[in-house]
Design a protein with these regions (language model features):
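Short amphipathic, basic-aromatic surface patches that mediate peripheral association
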Residues: 35-62, 174-178
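Beta-strand-rich domain onsets/edges
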Residues: 23-31, 158-168
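Bacterial Sec-dependent N-terminal signal peptides
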Residues: 19-47, 265
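Tryptophan-paired
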Residues: 60-125, 181-267
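Sec-dependent bacterial lipoprotein signal peptides
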Residues: 1-20
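Extracellular beta-sheet/turn segments enriched in Thr/Pro/Gly and aliphatic residues
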Residues: 134-166, 175, 255-272
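Short structural boundary motif marking the start of a folded domain
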Residues: 29-36, 67-69, 110, 168-170
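Beta-strand elements of well-folded, non-transmembrane domains
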Residues: 41, 75, 165, 176-178, ...
Length: 272
């Protein structure tokens, strides 16, 4: 009798086990990791106090603030690169840019680094974790960056990061009624700004920047130069020459050197 009961129980359990196995086999794969990239610094912090710089709308397409992107995803524990893009142009009118990563990426913890605004990878280090802000002593480009640690598992597969500007902008306005005859340009030598920034927003190194601007007669004279931050308050020296383009090495007017402070995502304005 006991043997008969055991046999009946076994027969009753078998279909249940088979049915449970079928349900398990039909579970869909977990969705791939998706990154949503937004822009935090859509305007300079003090843009409303500077007439020479126009405020951008807060609801423009992503590409109106940051035209290009490059990203690298690393395993948090090993540092190995899991996925990396080249520099690509941002297209479309989305305000937040979705990036679908490879479905082959396993669950885990990762570090995502995103750079924006560059035309190529020349200024970015080989490991993608730092950037030369003023390559070859030039002003370089208006670069954005974000970096974040990401948990990817069955419950966390959609993550948003925000791009922040790495540099500030120097604006020089000509307020004199008339400049000496023949002046149609300016040459700036800026001494004492940071040279590099890494993915932790740590600035290092020191460099000088040279910038030349030319203008047409009767043109409203405003020059704008994108610069990395100063090492300290009033720690950057500006030497300015007003020149004629035909002989830029012989300045026609040289104001007194001034100390300035450049800050990330801020406008510094001088008037002559």
């Amino acid at each position: 009798m006991k043997g008969t009961i055991r046999n009946i129980a076994y027969i009753l359990l078998l279909p249940a086990m088979t049915f449970t196995s079928c349900i398990r086999d039909e579970i869909e794969d977990c969705p791939p990791l998706q990154i949503n990239i937004a822009v935090k610094d859509k305007n300079y912090f003090n843009v409303d106090n500077v007439e020479a710089e126009q405020r951008k709308g807060d609801n423009l397409a992503f590409r109106e603030y940051v035209p290009t992107l490059y990203y690298v995803l690393r395993d948090l524990n090993t540092g190995d690169v899991v996925e990396e893009s080249g520099v690509f142009e941002v297209k479309g009118d989305k305000q937040i840019l979705p990036v679908d990563l490879c479905p082959c990426i396993p669950h885990g913890r990762y570090v995502l680094t995103v750079w924006g605004g560059m035309s190529n990878l020349d200024a970015i280090s080989e490991d993608g974790l730092s950037l030369d802000l003023n390559p070859n002593s030039t002003e370089g480009e208006d670069i954005y960056m974000t970096n974040d640690t990401i948990l990817y598992d069955a419950w966390h597969n959609n993550h948003t990061v925000e791009m922040e500007r790495t540099k500030g902008k120097l604006i020089i306005e000509k307020k004199w009624e008339c400049l000496p005859e023949g002046i149609n340009g300016s040459r700036k030598e800026i001494n004492g700004v940071y040279d590099n920034v890494n993915n932790a927003f740590k600035y290092t190194g020191i460099t000088d920047v040279l910038a030349t601007h030319l203008w047409e007669p009767e043109q409203n004279i405003i020059t704008k130069t994108v610069l990395s931050p100063s090492l300290k308050e009033n720690g950057t020296k500006l030497h300015l020459d007003f020149i004629n383009a035909s002989d830029p090495s012989s300045p026609l007017l040289t104001p007194k050197d001034v100390k300035i402070t450049m800050k990330r995502n801020e406008l510094t304005v001088l008037r002559y």
